[in-house]
Amino acid sequence: MEEGCSTLVRSLEQKYLDDDEDIVQDIIFTGFTGCSPCKMASQRALELLVLNNMNIDTIGDSEKLATLASHVSEADLGWNQISKWSDIACILKNLPHLRVLNIGHNPLNPVIDHELPVSTLHTIILNGTHLPFKTLQSFLSVLPKVTELHMSDNQFNDDDDCDEPISTTVRTVHLNRCGFLKWSSVMNVVKRFPNVCSVFVCENPLKDVTHCKHFEQLPFWNFLNLAKTSIDSWDSLDQLNRMTSISDLRVPNIPLLDALTNEERLHLIIGRLHHLRVLNGSKISSEQREQSERFFIRYYQEQKEKPLQYKTLIDKHGNLEKLVTIDLTPKKEAVVKILCEEKEVNQEITISLEPTVLDFMKILDPKVGVKFTRMKLFLLREDGRTDDFSSSDYNMPLHYFKIEDGDSFLVQEKIIVTRRRRPPSSTSSSSS
């Protein structure tokens, strides 16, 4: 063991166990629902083991590992210093219930030089290990139940001479951040998993997607995630339209869509890819598809260059009339007349429709010479209708009342009736 490094067993004890060494002796097995990880480990019922980035370079006491971690089903040992396949063999042998193993970003020997036991793992994470195809093939041969393989942050050699399938059980492959520039490099990896269903190639500088013969040999491939790639042309999506088995597509955050609105992104992708059933995690209903296909036709009607799918959709829906654009945003100004017979006011002005009715009355105050507190306001519309403003309308903005050019405001001054105080009666005066 190198100076400064630790063993897996020692790290496990330090993180999950007390200092009492007797704790690893035989303990009566009981139910452990709700126990802390420390207690779970001490009672040999720990199921989740997280020892990533702890400078582990070897296993340590394998018997102790078997005792403490016999019920572990998920182990995260990523970002350590494990390099020997004998240590991987020890993990697989002594963790019989292991289902998920992360040994990513460990400096594993590129050649397997130790016999590995058959394991029941169903997910293996090998991110950043840079293992050649031959080594992957040998490793996965002892993992007959693996269905999910993580190989992100790896560099792959297009000239690798291993042409045989790496695994026939893997259904999901993660190839994120692998530096892929060409689609052929992606297919060079994916083709080695003939029963693959889902492929992730996120955050690669990939600029295009190209249909090729290898795709036809992958009949179960139905999910593709291209998030944060560098795809910048519709040609790639036209190529995807030829990959008819892919019905679930994720393409958020790609340059191609940057200049489009959310509505345009949705409709132009669905309209282009007739076989899609799910886009960016949302199911596509039959109503959504028809709406998108009609949008697609209208979008390209006036453009000289029309995509391949355009004719197919014209045959399906026919030539569509262009939709009339109706601006429903509120007007900001109107040209109106201000009328006040008492003050002989009759003038045409341009008013803002943003202020409230009360604020507008305050604006009219000096113009018509009627105090806003004594003002009665009417709206005379050009079509002959008349609206009067009550106190309940005072806090509403003017645009709420659909004021149009040519309408008039009539201002009247409220008549304030004052009552005179009755003079004191002579009787009351004399009695006092």
Curated annotation (Swiss-Prot):
Region annotation (Ubiquitin-like (UBL)) ranges: 324-415
Positions of the UniProt region annotated as LRRCT: 254-295
Cited PANTHER family: CILIA- AND FLAGELLA-ASSOCIATED PROTEIN 410-RELATED, LEUCINE RICH REPEAT PROTEIN
GO BP term, example: tubulin complex assembly
Gene Ontology CC entries for this record: cytoplasm; cytoskeleton
Cell compartments where the protein resides: Cytoplasm, Cytoskeleton
Organism: Caenorhabditis elegans
Role: Acts as a regulator of tubulin stability. Involved in microtubule-dependent neuronal function. May be involved in tubulin acetylation/deacetylation pathway.
GO molecular function: alpha-tubulin binding
Chief subcellular location: cytoplasm
Keywords: Cytoplasm, Cytoskeleton, Leucine-rich repeat, Repeat
Identification of the protein by name: Tubulin-specific chaperone cofactor E-like protein
